[in-house]
A protein has these predicted regions:
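Helicase P-loop NTPase motor core
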Residues: 51-54, 89-105, 333-336, 341-434
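Coupling/switch/interface segments within P-loop NTPase motor domains and analogous charged loops
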Residues: 174-242
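Conserved short internal alpha-helix adjacent to the catalytic or cofactor-binding core
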Residues: 429-431, 436, 443-451
Length: 451
């Protein structure tokens, strides 16, 4: 048995012993990896190593559980255990590693109790690959996936509660547009006035607000908007046809998962009990449905860690709401906030320029990126009179670089909208500069400057 003073020393030594495993992280990264209990907002600036932190955090949860974040010593701890840990911290001995791990473990997490959600298949694939490299085969049991992949797993198990079968089909955007186009034709609507892609945008926004077809129709009829009533009727028919085909579109996958969790207590309780730890990446890009999904899954233990950067929120046009990350602390009282501000990607001059621009944003959480890298080349700013002048300047700079000995492929042009590419194409053609494109072409020729 330990007295109170010894218990405090034991907890301190345990935290220090665990931290030795994560000496490759910087201090703030290490704090994030070792924070296990309760809600955590990780404000991760660009190039700050957030994926590395997520991987080490999951590894810590599985290896040591709550050991790095626990203020209680185990009842079985003896003075000899305290002496061992304090000695190990001062002089780590690989031969004593097994005993150190035994003394530091507190309720370690099993892999299937952890769900880590990110936005893209590429990011999810990288997360899985790096987890497997660090943790071995046990990493395969972690729910590391996109929002849609995680929801499909949940729906395959219980979607019969909503009137579908587990063998449901998933419609992609092209499938959805085809169904909408057929409905527009059947309803004798002008496809130019009621473009299928535009209608899908209305339907997507309605679903994000959790409005089913009949609810949306009633709302539009009450508002008395003739055009919206027509769109709502298309939505209701679209919903009916998908149900008849036992099919879901991309929005349905998350919407129906949220409906399932909200409307069936046993399903909700099963997943809230199952997932002790919920981690959400790119939280600044979440929409209302994704927010509801994350908060519902975390409703059991409230061990939710969200990673994001309010300075990188650019998907409002897709339904993303920055309020999800800005209001995290008010939703979860006592939430910890850790800022990852050390940048491993850029030079000092680039960071100083970006900090100077972004600090003018209103309502931001606030952080100041810094780096140990050299200053690098200065950032030059050119204010063009119009798009033509801008494109001419860019083309001239590239030509000057080529004349100075740089290769064409050493130059990259980033632009905000695809519509800007036409002027750049024309200016590049005038200087005979070869270009390669990345993304869909905005012109009929398909030639574009590379983003």
């Amino acid at each position: 048995m330990l007295n109170r003073e010894e218990e405090l020393r034991f907890c301190k030594a345990r935290r220090a012993a665990i931290a030795l495993d994560y000496q490759n992280l910087n201090p703030e990264q290490r704090r994030a990896a070792l924070a296990t209990d309760g809600p955590l907002l990780l404000l991760a600036g660009a190039g700050s190593g957030k994926t590395t932190v997520l991987i080490h955090r999951i590894a810590n949860l599985m290896k040591y559980g709550r050991g790095s974040d626990c203020d209680e010593a185990p009842a079985w701890a003896a003075p000899a255990d305290l002496a061992f840990l304090e000695g190990y911290v001062q002089n780590p001995d690989p031969a004593q590693k097994a005993e150190q791990e035994r003394l530091c473990r507190v309720d370690p997490a099993v892999p299937w109790s952890i769900i880590a959600i990110t936005f893209t298949n590429k990011a999810a694939g990288e997360l899985k690959e790096r987890l497997e490299r660090m943790l071995g085969p046990s990493a395969n049991d972690i729910w590391a996936s996109t929002f849609h992949s995680a929801c499909v797993r949940i729906l395959r198990r219980d979607i019969d509660r909503l009137g579908f079968t587990s063998s449901f089909t998933i419609y992609d955007t092209a499938d959805s547009e085809r169904v909408i186009k057929d409905i527009v034709k059947d309803f004798n609507l002008d496809e130019k006035a009621f473009a299928p892609r535009s209608i899908l945008g209305y339907i997507s926004r309605a679903k994000d607000a959790m409005k089913l077809g009949k609810d949306y129709l009633q709302e539009c009829e009450k508002a008395g908007d003739y055009r919206l009533v027509k769109i709502a009727k298309v939505y209701a028919e679209y919903e009916r046809r998908l149900r008849e085909a036992n099919a879901l579109d991309f929005d349905d996958i998350i919407l129906d998962t949220v409906r399932l969790l909200q409307n069936f207590d046993d399903v909700r309780e099963y997943y809230q009990k199952k997932f002790r730890y919920v981690l959400i990446d790119e939280y600044q890009d979440t929409n209302n449905l994704q927010y509801l999904l994350a908060s519902t899954l975390a409703g059991g233990y409230e061990n939710i860690c969200v990673v994001g950067d309010d300075d990188q929120s650019i998907y409002r046009f897709r339904g993303a709401t920055i309020e999800n990350i800005l209001s995290f602390e008010s939703q979860y009282k006592g939430a910890r906030v850790i800022r990852l501000e050390q940048n491993y990607r850029s030079t000092k001059n680039i960071l100083e320029a970006s900090n100077a621009v972004i600090r003018n944003n209103e309502g931001r959480k606030g952080k100041e990126l810094w780096t140990e890298h050299e200053a690098g080349d200065k950032v030059h700013c050119y204010t063009a009179m119009n798009e033509h002048d801008e494109a001419q300047f860019v083309a001239a700079q590239i030509l000057a670089g080529f004349s100075a000995g740089r290769g064409w492929r050493d130059h990259a042009v980033l632009y905000r909208m695809n519509a800007q590419s036409n002027q750049l194409e024309q200016a590049s053609s005038a200087t005979a500069s070869p270009t390669a494109s990345s993304g869909a072409s905005a012109s009929s020729t398909g030639r574009r400057s590379r983003t």
